[in-house]
Amino acid sequence: MALPVVAIIGRPNVGKSTLVNRLCQSREAIVHDEPGVTRDRTYQDGFWRDRDFKVVDTGGLVFDDDSEFLPEIREQANLALEEAVVALVIVDGQEGITTADESIAEFLRSRSCKTLVVVNKCESPEQGLAMAAEFWKLGLGEPYPISAIHGVGTGDLLDQVVNLFPSKDLDEVSDSPVQLAIIGRPNVGKSSLLNSICGETRAIVSSIRGTTRDTIDTRITHQGKEWKLVDTAGIRRRRSVNYGPEFFGINRSFKAIERSDVCVLVIDALDGVTEQDQRLAGRIEQEGRACLIVINKWDAVEKDSHTMSAMEKDIRSKLYFLDWAQMIFTSAVTGQRVEGIFALATLAVDQSRRRVTTSVVNEVLTEALKWRSPPTTRGGKQGRLYYGTQVAINPPSFTLFVNEPKLFGETYRRYIERQIREGLGFEGTPIKLFWRGKQQRDVEKDMARQQKGVQN
């Protein structure tokens, strides 16, 4: 059974995102004093009284404005209400009832989900009761006074919300979904790609650059595996971003890379690889995340039988530090090869979580040493690689024990990394090597202990 969903609905600047952060104990939702800052619906995890649930934050609803985004924001609110068990209608207790509040109340009366009126900006219980009384006029039931900033009344509100959830299936066991972050510059088609994958208009798509300013989380199931897809704000060069909501969205995009299991780096086939694409790729490599490179807008490229191979060669030369990443050419508009993203992303995640026994690691190292001996200094001192062992996953990490790490230059280290990757068949994930100095006698003791363990 899916987690219950709580939808946050209201006009601009009544404190919806602040309440989301309070309910979910996070700072994920963008909080900034500008109408319409939240334009897509964004999901966060909540927990109260032994119940897990999802909180979906929607854009500020307005019914008397002709702005390009407002019809789309209303559509996002509709989609949120369709999946919600409870809708929280947020109003401003200090302003009182407005025409916009009345329009939203009318909008909600035809919806099937349960509705609670939440009167925000009530900074004390006594003040709150007086402010809340006016909102009975909306005809949506009892108003609940709270202060999202200070937390006043939020415990009572959560008690009521949880009471409206369906009964919990105690036998249910849910595995953590694979977290897939869709990363890229503005306007490369990330949101269109997400919509093509999900089969619904999940993120607002517009020709205006930077129209996704939050990270947008979507859960889907594909061939029995649960995925959490994160569509991030387009990431620009830092000096071109002001300290407004876009700045916070970009930083959240970097956070999405950190918490992802696999990143889909989206490149515009018409633009090719830019400096900013290289910086993004470097960030993914730095964080040690599995990665898939998606070349989007392939339908718009004039091509012949050699175009794909030539473009792949060019892209790989510019993203050489992601030479281990799989690449796929797609069109989010036509759906071409979009289905293949799951197969390659699954491969990358599985590879990043793979463990290899110490004996197999050392078989590969022994073969590598046969083909190319460690370097020797001008003074005649040669490096010695004793053995290696895997010490971590996500990404796969190996410690190599040697006589003196400084004897192994960058060229030889890259050679060993390449031999480990090819010999062990790692694809779609970076690997990390740690070079550790060790005395010969300590190595002999280690080998003796390992041999004894095998015999036992």
Swiss-Prot record:
GTPase that plays an essential role in the late steps of ribosome biogenesis. Associates with the 50S ribosomal subunit. HAMAP family: GTPase_Der. PANTHER family: GTPASE DER (PTHR43834:SF6). Belongs to the TRAFAC class TrmE-Era-EngA-EngB-Septin-like GTPase superfamily. EngA (Der) GTPase family. GTP 2 binds at residues 184-191, 231-235, 296-299. SUPFAM superfamilies: P-loop containing nucleoside triphosphate hydrolases (SSF52540). InterPro entries: AAA+_ATPase, G_ENGA, GTP-bd, GTPase_Der, KH_dom-like, KH_dom-like_a/b, P-loop_NTPase, Small_GTP-bd. GTP 1 binds at residues 10-17, 57-61, 120-123. Residues 4-169, 178-353 form the EngA-type G domain. This is GTPase Der. NCBIfam families: GTPase_EngA (TIGR03594), small_GTP (TIGR00231). Pfam families: KH_dom-like (PF14714), MMR_HSR1 (PF01926). The lineage of its organism: Bacteria, Bacillati, Cyanobacteriota, Cyanophyceae, Synechococcales. Signal peptide: none annotated.
